[in-house]
Amino acid sequence: MANDPLEGFHEVNLASPTSPDLLGVCDPGTQEQTTSPSVIYRPHPSTLCSATIQANALNLSDLPTQPVYSSPRHLNCAEISNISIHVPEPASSVASEVAAGLTRFTSRKDSCNAEREFLQGATVTEASAGNDDIFGLSTDSLSRLRSPSVLEVREKGYERLKEELAKAQRELKLKDEECERLSKVRDQLGQELEELTASLFEEAHKMVREANVKQATAEKQLKEAQGKIDVLQAEVAALKTLVLSSSPTSPTQEPLAAGKTPFKRGHTRNKSTSSAMSGSHQDFSAIQPIVKDCREADLSLYNEFRSWKDEPTMDRTCPFLDKIYQEDIFPCLTFAKSELASAVLEAVENNTLSIEPVGLQPIRFVKASAVECGGPKKCALTGQSKPCKHRIKLGDSSSYYYISPVCRYRITSVCNFFTYIRYIQQGLVKQQDVDQMFWEVMQLRKEMSLAKLGYFKEEL
């Protein structure tokens, strides 16, 4: 079985992956071997040339044991057409077998020629497309076997696209987060701007209101200060008058003008009847004593004043002021309306009391609180029905109290005393020594004593 010939081995090589064809046979005459580039497996030339070739028959011993790879050659159509198969002349002993074999071989040759023509057409087609390699199909098959498959390429491309898509999605997510963060920042800045604007407007309105209130308060204080200035100017003028009148250098009596006789009270007697008594009258006037005003300070009171002068204070508990409070101030400001009298004393001490002349103000313009406190026909301190030419105001109160002339004089005498000792406390009295200050205080106490006894001066 092993030596049985195999027919058609030159056409199909079972060991070849590319199904090569045997296109050339060794010529015994020239010993030239023509091998087609498409033949991958071929028998050795020595075997083909030495052995007798039987038509369409091969022995197993003639098969190659190793694959023979032909070097790549670039053949054109002309070379392919010149390829021929040379068969040696058969021996005479086997003429009959050769004839039958030739018949079969001729049919095989025709089929090979048809296959060669088909390959030539395919080669020409590839050459017209720009490919000169006659073994393009074989090379492409090998390249497909060596290169990755289409599925792997697609999978790699799909993976790369997935990676790029994931990267783009990550970038888009980052962009969205950045946009969201910027939107939050924008909203926060807008809210802060609105709050700041609202606070600025509120602060501006608050400042305007405060400015208006301060302006109104300043105007009110200005009016009150102007009223106080007028009152103080009147008090200063009164104090100047008191100082000038109590000064020892001021004349107490002006000399009579020349040629004028002094006014005599009573009736005049007849000259005839009075001439007899003239001598006795002159003797009586001669023996009448001359009277002058004299003064002497109380030593204890003077020492108390000197002690107070060294450290002046408005505290009523000090010995000097306590005695004046008990002897002059309290009796002078004691009225039937005790509550109002206490308020008047407190206002005098705080220097917040103001006195205004009523003038010819109609009753319809008088405030209701002032009318309730007595009105211009009734004194608010004594409760007596007397014409009231002045009214007082206590501190920042809007109420006015109408007072009679005697009450007004009693209040002004106490105000004059407090004004003078305030000047001493503030160091404004510098032109007088301690004795002059003491006697000025005594003069003010005298006025308070006269006022509490009912003596007063009224302006006509």
Swiss-Prot record:
Residues 246-280 are annotated as: Disordered. Residues 271-280 have a biased composition (Polar residues). Residues 149-244 form a coiled coil. Its main location: cytoplasm. Ubiquitously expressed. Expressed at highest level in testis. It is found in: Cytoplasm; Nucleus; Cytoplasm, Cytoskeleton; Cell projection, Lamellipodium. GO terms for cellular component: centrosome; cytosol; lamellipodium; nucleoplasm; nucleus; perinuclear region of cytoplasm; proximal dendrite. Belongs to the SEC2 family. This is Rab-3A-interacting protein.
